[in-house]
């Protein structure tokens, strides 16, 4: 008895597998196998369907992919059809420079993406583009300085003038400062004995003459404020006698005002030389220790003048001393 074939064997064969070639390789094979190395779009379709059973069935999508690859890849060149030959559609051929697109002629391996080289017509454009930057960067030999001046508007080396240097400015300062300070420096009074000796004028005139001070409450004279300037910048024009006497008067005033020890005043008086005469004047004598009374005279001098409260004074009649204050009347 003969066995009947199984239904599985009667079933159609399995679906063919897709070939391992890209669409570019399929198009290249179709063009190379056609006469004249050129083929139309319909001829490419027929070649692919006749060789590979996978594309025989009308599967949508692959034909559109063939058209896209023909138009997008530069290795395929479109050649217009001759009017003398009947038919419709243009021919497609391979670019002559794409012979090495596949390795060893194998369509399975594509070497690299093909880029179309510039032809005879395309060389004119790049040549102009190349010449334009060459003209811009290579100036005429006759005018090299103008281009360098445009590129660098500022001079490369700027001379440093001596007048603007720091040393030049500081070198000229001492001369100017010395002349300015000598003019602005306050001149000390040449006759300091006038402040420490009695005058024939009344108390009101003496107070007006000796009281233009910034501290009217304490009655400091303007000469008292110059004590620091005298120690810092001595004036060569003042005699040593006048300097010593003025310094003694100022220190006496300061000591009486601040209430220091009277023993220091004897040291100050003894340290000051008096080249004028051997006997000290009334202004140079050491003051006597003062009691704690409210108002007392300094020293009994040779010019007794009636004060405001009836006390005889040895120094200017307008000077009085209280335990915490020294003022002019």
UniProtKB/Swiss-Prot annotation:
It is found in: Nucleus. Residues 175-184 have a biased composition (Polar residues). Pfam families: Forkhead. Gene3D superfamilies: Winged helix-like DNA-binding domain superfamily/Winged helix DNA-binding domain. PROSITE patterns: FORK_HEAD_1 (PS00657), FORK_HEAD_2 (PS00658), FORK_HEAD_3 (PS50039). It comes from the Eukaryota. GO terms for biological process: blood vessel development; negative regulation of DNA-binding transcription factor activity; negative regulation of DNA-templated transcription; negative regulation of transcription by RNA polymerase II; neuromuscular process controlling balance; positive regulation of multicellular organism growth. Residues 17-108 bind DNA. The keyword Transcription applies. InterPro entries: FH_FOXS1 (IPR047364), Fork_head_dom (IPR001766), FOX_domain-containing (IPR050211), TF_fork_head_CS_1 (IPR018122), TF_fork_head_CS_2 (IPR030456), WH-like_DNA-bd_sf (IPR036388), WH_DNA-bd_sf (IPR036390). Keywords: DNA-binding, Nucleus, Repressor, Transcription, Transcription regulation. GO terms for cellular component: nucleus. One of its GO terms (molecular function) is DNA binding. Residues 117-150, 174-213 are annotated as: Disordered. Its main location: nucleus. Transcriptional repressor that suppresses transcription from the FASLG, FOXO3 and FOXO4 promoters. May have a role in the organization of the testicular vasculature. This is Forkhead box protein S1. It comes from Mus musculus (Mouse). The gene is Foxs1.
